[in-house]
Curated annotation (Swiss-Prot):
InterPro entries the UniProt entry points to: Cytochrome_b-c1_su10_fun
Function: Component of the ubiquinol-cytochrome c oxidoreductase, a multisubunit transmembrane complex that is part of the mitochondrial electron transport chain which drives oxidative phosphorylation.
Quaternary structure and interacting proteins, as annotated: Component of the ubiquinol-cytochrome c oxidoreductase (cytochrome b-c1 complex, complex III, CIII), a multisubunit enzyme composed of 3 respiratory subunits cytochrome b, cytochrome c1 and Rieske protein, 2 core protein subunits, and additional low-molecular weight protein subunits. The complex exists as an obligatory dimer and forms supercomplexes (SCs) in the inner mitochondrial membrane with cytochrome c oxidase (complex IV, CIV).
Keywords attached to this entry: Electron transport, Membrane, Mitochondrion, Mitochondrion inner membrane, Respiratory chain, Transmembrane, Transmembrane helix, Transport
Name this polypeptide is given: Cytochrome b-c1 complex subunit 10
Pfam family, one: QCR10
Amino acid sequence: MISFFPNKPMYHVQPHISFITPERTMKTIPAFSRWAFAAVAGVFVFAMQVPKVKTTILQPIAFIGDHFKDKTPEEDKWL
């Protein structure tokens, strides 16, 4: 009898954890990283007004730190 498939395909189970496979993970990493970047940027937009965030996180940044320093004269501060 002649075989229809002289080089038979080798079927095997793809490695997975539940429904998460390496192929599916590689497809979702770019989308996840974009959403994570947008979430972090959103947190910084809302947290920029908090004085503790300004002094401890934003002011030490090299090029944009001067933007967050308070340059208001003392006589103009009322709080």
